[in-house]
Amino acid sequence: HNDFKLDNIMWSNSNPFDPVAVFDWDMCTRGDPLMDLGHMLNYWIDETDDEDCKLITSMPVTTISYPRREEIIGYYAMKTGFNVDNINWYYAFGAFKLAVILQQIFYRYQKGQTQDRRFSNFGKRVNALINRANNIF
């Protein structure tokens, strides 16, 4: 999928843990499924993350009803049978990849090519992602 995160999933009305559709296929590529997990982990903020990391996303995952990153990794391994021993590589790569995407959007915002005020702090988000990627290992 290449952009797997909560706001790209539609959940069942009868069971909020049952995904019924995945949206936003414009960046879809073939590849290692662990790339989706690594990418998603960058949108998943734990309550113990520093404030810079919390800038990265607006996903509401710090509430008590959502699992922590480590729990997601374990659940993913259990459900897929995939080896997640090297997940930090995918997590770091996902952070760098997302930083590049946000930098492109921030550049366009600074040049006046887009007016959406949500992009005004993307420079800080880019720096937070680069710092995260550098500190994962």
Where are these regions (language model features)?
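All-alpha amphipathic helical-bundle segments outside canonical DNA-binding/catalytic cores
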Residues: F82-G94
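Active-site activation/catalytic loop segments of kinase-like enzymes and analogous catalytic loops
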Residues: M35-T80, G94-K111
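Active-site acidic catalytic loop and adjacent metal/ATP-binding pocket
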Residues: H1-M35, H39-L41
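Conserved NTP-binding catalytic cores of kinases and kinase-like/nucleotidyltransferase enzymes
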Residues: M10-A21, L55, T80-D85, F119
